[in-house]
Swiss-Prot record:
Residues 254-263 have a biased composition (Basic and acidic residues). Keywords: Cytoplasm, Developmental protein, Differentiation, Golgi apparatus, Membrane, Mitochondrion, Spermatogenesis. The gene is Ggnbp1. This is Gametogenetin-binding protein 1. InterPro entries: Ub_USP-typ. Residues 26-113, 237-268 are annotated as: Disordered. Induces mitochondrial fragmentation, possibly by promoting DNM1L-dependent fission and may play a role in mitochondrial morphogenesis during spermatogenesis.
């Protein structure tokens, strides 16, 4: 009866005390939700679940608004022990810097999928991370502590802030070092130009074919070099005496020759021409130039025994370029030298025999003949 006889004021006071109690409960729940709470060790559900969190990166690398609150479910293994489940996080674009590797403000870590073509498996206390295997990433990840903690310990408490910092450095090194190019390898056309230039070229100009044309030489330069080589070979052949032509050796006008033939000693200024001997086999006269002769050797001239003295004298003047008056002597006979004064007689009629010579004597500048010896 006393409870039923309560006044409205007492009811209002009771409701207010109840409201204060509820407010205190709600406030404690809200504060516990805002703090870093440990992982829920509830029983696993029949189907495996994974909470997906996609943080939005700002211009300075900070994490933005989170779409869903991450949940961590611990699975129970066959032996009754609980094992933490991996998390899957969607990371920001590769050109932005990641300061928090896990993408969460809390202490739990997860796994990030960077790009579809990069694969890296990092195992740190039940957490799987897929990323790109680069050299810089491996060097950073080698220093990550891999500790085997208790099987039922939450994953966020095991990794800690140091793991997140190391993993963030690995991602930064990966973004700076990794540059993969998809598709087939494309070679620029400049790579084939050098190979074509290194090859030998074949130039066809009608009947003239030039092969093995090296790099850096133009066809004109090659033709010019070929012409110079042909010119040199032609000059070399021209300097050689002809095998079919008769060979005439030049002899010095000395008193005694190697063959024992005696030649009359005369003044060198008057000595212009010498015919060594008349051969009876071919009826030809062979001659030699004296030592003081300024003409280049070999000088070749053939006279027959039927040629006249005047013809021989005129030919010798042309060859020796004698401008003044000259006369022809026959030397080598026992009586001494003999002057040939009849230009109409032949050499055979003049008595030219084997062992005799012809001497062309020129008048000096004063118009005098050289004195006889």
């Amino acid at each position: 009866m006393a409870a039923q006889a309560r006044t409205p004021r007492s009811r209002i006071l009771g409701c207010s005390s109840m409201l204060r109690f509820l407010r205190s409960l709600v406030g404690s729940k809200g504060s516990s939700k805002s703090s870093n709470r440990p992982l829920n060790r509830s029983q696993p559900s029949s189907s495996p679940e994974q909470d997906v969190v996609s943080p939005t990166m700002g211009h300075q690398g900070g994490c933005g608004r989170k779409e869903t609150r991450p949940r961590v479910l611990s699975a129970t293994s066959s032996n009754g022990k609980r094992e933490p489940r991996p998390r899957v996080l969607s990371a920001a674009p590769s050109n932005q810097r990641l300061r928090d590797a896990s993408g969460l403000g809390t202490g739990d870590t997860g796994s990030q999928t960077l790009t579809s073509k990069d694969v890296l498996k990092l195992r740190a206390q039940g957490v799987e991370v897929t990323s790109v295997p680069t050299r810089g990433t491996w060097e950073v990840l080698e220093h990550l502590p891999e500790k085997k903690g208790e099987e039922g310990e939450p994953a966020g408490e095991v990794s800690g802030a140091s793991d997140r910092a190391h993993f963030g450095q690995a991602l930064e090194a990966e973004q700076g070092c990794l540059q993969w190019v998809s598709g087939p390898m494309v070679l620029p056309p400049e790579a084939f130009i050098k190979e074509e230039e290194d090859e030998h070229c074949l130039i066809d100009f009608g009947d003239l074919r030039l092969s093995s044309c090296k790099v850096g030489s133009t066809p004109w330069n090659y033709l010019l070099g070929l012409y110079k080589q042909l010119q040199k070979s032609a000059m070399t052949k021209a300097q050689r005496p002809d095998a079919d032509a008769p060979q005439f050796a030049l002899k010095d006008s000395s008193p005694t020759e190697e063959r024992g033939e005696r030649e009359e000693a005369v003044d060198e200024s008057s000595l212009k021409w010498c015919a060594p001997r008349a051969s009876s086999d071919d009826s030809n006269l062979k001659w030699c130039a004296p030592r003081n002769s300024t003409y280049q050797s070999p000088l070749q001239k053939t006279f027959r025994s039927t040629d006249t003295v005047g013809f021989v004298e005129s030919e010798l003047k042309k060859i020796l370029a004698v401008q003044r008056e000259a006369r022809l002597w026959k030397v080598g006979n026992p009586e001494g030298r003999e002057l040939l004064t009849q230009p109409d007689i032949t050499l055979e009629e003049a008595g030219m025999v084997d062992g005799q010579h012809l001497l062309l004597e020129e008048m000096d500048e004063m118009g005098n003949w050289p004195p006889p010896e």
